[in-house]
Amino acid sequence: QAQKSVSRCFEDGKDWQTPSGSFFTTKPLGQEKIAFVYPGGFNTYVGSGNSLFEMDPELHERSLSYSSKIKTLLHPEFLFPQSPSIQSEEELKQLQQQFYDSPNPMFESGISSAVLATQVMRNAFGIEPHAAFGYSMGEVSMLFSLGVWGSMDPMSEVLNASPLFHERIAGPMNSVREYWKLKDTDFQNESLWSWYTLRAEPELVTKALEKRER
């Protein structure tokens, strides 16, 4: 969708913007300056970055300076599934949902993918940023990608040892259950927590929420 929309921008001269915040214009405000932008969590998807190592044959060797277990951090079982395991579009959707429901693999693959993509931009294409910024988890990706921080291995160890994304705000979401005083058996077959983009005035949303128990 992004590829089609960007192409259309050159045809009709209009900007492209999505509800999630993606933006493209053929008329940038500045000239010749380049910024690397690093997105937040949950931005990787099945098949993303599958051509990076082809673009830059030396990428794997350089990646070892960022992690001694780069393959593990990329989570190839999600990013690069073997074709015999995916036989239909429905199976692909199921794998993507499983990926989305696995915060730690999603975060680790997102950060390590950002590191690799930055390496390709700088070493294979010779593009150096004049500035960089990251949103949420993107701050972590930015600091690792640009060499401000060293090895990603300690980050992975802390992430996997912490209960935060295993059961506090993911999985059974025990933090939410404790705050709302819910039982373990509540919300077993329905969504406990969701977020939405609402195109409405804050006052209208606040008023509508007054009728809700939670």
Where are these regions (language model features)?
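Helix-enriched interaction subdomains in cytosolic or periplasmic regions
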Residues: 1-15
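Short, intrinsically disordered, charge-balanced linker/junction segments flanking boundaries
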Residues: 1, 209-214
